[in-house]
UniProtKB/Swiss-Prot annotation:
It is an enzyme of class 2 (transferase). It comes from the Bacteria. It holds the Pfam family Rhodanese. GO terms for cellular component: cytoplasm. The keyword Endoplasmic reticulum does not apply. This is Thiosulfate sulfurtransferase.
């Protein structure tokens, strides 16, 4: 049995610190190359956040090529018995997107370090500069559709009583006053709750303690299918993570996000 098996999805520095030597642990740092070089959690392997995305217009947030994912997870030493702990330094956007990737490859043994590197540092935990070597070459992966919503799927679900579209962008993008695509505004019926509003800056960017009640009041509830997006499914990595951490049973990331929806000729929008 894993030493992580009794822990919730979201863990604290005090949970991780005594488990850093666990043989099943793959610790993933999604900060930046510069931040990682300055000091990271001991044993952490750096993943450039850009490697979690397709990176090409018009929808850079789509999944990377399967071969690129197989190379990435080979470097990390992916194996069925592994437990991932994932962190970043921005409150959970990139870490949440990586957790979405783990769901896509069908691997569900994972945790998010609440608050990420800022919380680890605030708790006076140790940092290291040692860089672990890549473990191996490409590994064959099976990609699963369930964690993802395509544009066509989202469009087919619009208006359903059991759907909540969680728009993680800022209010000006949602309202259409800030335009980052051919079309401005939002997906019809979408609920706007900006990703950073779910973080507590007084607690080193940890997920705010009342997030379940906030989402309930907004109508983003566990009885609905929650499809979350932003511009490139980076910010909505955090909102995907939050819904998963709260135990919502039907959560999907719309990886195309507004960069796809807002540039497609056949998508409806509201302002």
């Amino acid at each position: 049995m894993s030493v992580f098996s009794d822990l919730p999805l979201v863990i604290e520095p005090s949970d991780l610190a005594p488990r850093l030597g666990a043989p099943e642990l793959i610790l993933v740092d999604l900060t930046s190359a510069a931040r990682y070089a300055e000091g990271h959690i001991p044993g952490a392997r750096f993943v450039d956040p850009k490697r979690t995305q397709w990176g090409q217009p018009p929808a850079p947030g789509l999944l990377p090529a399967k071969a690129d994912l197989e190379a990435l997870f080979g470097e990390l030493g992916h194996r069925p018995e592994a437990t991932y702990v994932v962190y970043d330094d921005e409150g959970g956007g990139w870490a949440g997107r990586f957790i979405w990737l783990l769901d896509v490859i069908g691997h569900h043994h994972y945790h998010y370090l609440n608050g990420g590197l800022p919380a680890w540092i605030a708790d006076a935990q140790a940092l290291d500069r040692e860089v672990p070597a890549p473990v191996g070459g490409p590994l064959p992966l099976t990609l699963h559709d369930e964690p993802s919503a395509t544009r066509e799927y989202l469009q087919s679900r619009l208006g359903a009583a059991d759907l909540a579209v969680w728009d993680a962008r800022n209010p000006s993008e949602y309202a259409g006053t800030k335009v980052l695509a051919a079309k401005a505004g939002h997906v019809p019926g979408a609920i706007n709750f900006e990703w950073t509003a779910g973080m507590d800056p007084a607690r080193a960017l940890r997920i705010r303690a009342d997030i379940a009640e906030v989402l309930e009041d907004l109508g983003i509830t566990p009885d609905k299918e929650v499809i979350t997006h932003c511009q490139t499914h980076h910010r909505s990595g955090f909102t995907y993570l939050v819904a998963k951490a709260l135990g919502y049973p039907r959560v999907k990331g719309y990886a195309g996000s507004w960069s796809e929806w807002g540039n497609h000729p056949d998508t409806p929008v509201e302002v």
